[in-house]
Design a protein with these regions (language model features):
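Intracellular alpha-helical coupling/juxtamembrane segments of multi-pass membrane proteins
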Residues: 250-274, 286, 290-307
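Generic structural signal for secondary-structure transition and capping sites
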Residues: 91, 209, 273, 280, ...
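Flexible loop/N-cap segments at domain edges
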Residues: 307-317
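ABC ATP-binding cassette signature C-motif
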Residues: 1-262, 315-317
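Short, flexible, glycine-rich and Lys/Arg-enriched loop motifs at helix boundaries
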Residues: 151, 280-286, 312
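A structural signal for long alpha-helical coiled-coils and helix-turn connectors
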Residues: 104-108, 247, 276-279, 298-301
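Alpha-helix initiation and N-capping motif
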Residues: 79, 138, 294, 308-310
Length: 317
């Protein structure tokens, strides 16, 4: 288990959003959080990230694991180019690269034992740089930006020139190059064309980490996720499989619950009719029997009638 939500509750004033929400996500798992608009999906992601506080419960992230978050609306500013904005998301790699360049220059002025010591340090740091993906990093940045729909000409554009949608794509690119252990993505396909969506699907499926997605695109979720967490009437319900698997299981659960509801309603009406009849006899014994049945009815845990499935998912063609 890499991420666990335990008994999360959240209200805004008198408006209850989440109630006793519990689920866990395994390492390398790809999961979706679904529900109607206003169900609390984005709020839940913010609670996981620590951008919102819950009224109760806790979020547990496995020790030494990193987490990254793409919100629906991003406002990336500054005077860098698109390419540099994403490139500088990994300053650790750039700093390692600069140290290697500095050592290469310093080697020209070193001889003998000093040179050997410097070369030993260089080889060790060069190996670490390779393990961190440093030698492929610049081409990786270019590949991710192109995958997200930016052309070669776009890469030299200033961030200040970009639209809100383009800035969100840049933010997504920055997140992808940092490779956190857990990716939280809130509507990652909103500003992508079909080609870029397909690229992102492939990227996330191959991603060596955990991915948690809020999205409205059913086909996208079908191709990426293997678990669905539904936020329904303030609580969380977990289904294994992709979105289509979830939809089938949810329909069956609703059908079974509807049968239970109608069966219970029939029994309640029957008991109410018996109570009315017993009271009509107007005898002490009959009234006591009626009162006994009323107490029994009061103790019954009423099944709520399941509402229509209005999960806010659309088909993107």
């Amino acid at each position: 288990m890499i991420l666990s939500c335990q008994s999360i509750s959240k209200s805004f004033g008198t408006d209850e959003i989440l109630k006793d929400v519990s689920f866990h996500i395994e390492a390398n798992e790809k999961a979706a959080i679904v529900g109607i608009n206003g169900a609390g999906k984005s709020t839940l992601l913010k609670i996981i990230m620590g951008e919102e506080t819950s009224d109760a419960g806790e979020v547990i992230l496995a020790k030494d694991k990193t987490i990254g978050y793409l919100a629906q609306y991003q406002d990336v500013s500054g005077h860098r180019t698109i390419y540099d904005e994403v490139l500088y998301a990994r300053t650790d790699i750039l700093e390692m690269e600069q140290k290697l360049r500095d050592m290469e220059s310093e080697m020209n002025s070193r001889t003998g034992e000093e040179l050997e010591k410097l070369m030993d340090i260089y080889h060790r740091q060069s190996h670490e740089f390779e393990l961190q993906g440093g030698y492929a990093y610049r081409s990786e940045v270019t590949g991710i930006l192109k995958g997200l729909g930016f052309s070669d000409e776009d890469l030299s554009k200033q961030m200040s020139e970009l639209s809100g949608g383009q800035k969100t794509r840049v933010s997504l690119g920055k997140l992808l190059v940092t490779k956190p252990d857990v990716l939280l993505l809130d509507e990652p396909t909103n500003h992508l064309d079909m080609e870029s969506i397909r690229w992102l699907e492939n990227f996330l499926r191959a991603y060596k980490g955990t991915v948690v997605i809020v999205a409205h695109d059913r086909y996208f979720l079908d191709r990426v996720v293997t678990k669905v967490v539904e936020i329904f009437q303030h609580k969380a319900y977990v289904y294994q499989g992709n979105y289509s698997d979830f939809a089938k299981k949810k329909a069956k659960v609703r059908e079974d619950l509807l049968k239970q509801y109608y069966n219970q309603q029939r029994e309640i009406r029957h008991q109410e009719e018996v109570i009315t009849k017993l009271k009509s006899f107007n005898r002490e014994k009959s009234i006591k029997r009626a009162e006994s049945r009323e107490k029994m009815l009061d103790k019954i845990e009423r099944i709520e009638k399941p509402v229509e499935d209005n999960t806010d998912i659309k088909i993107v063609l």
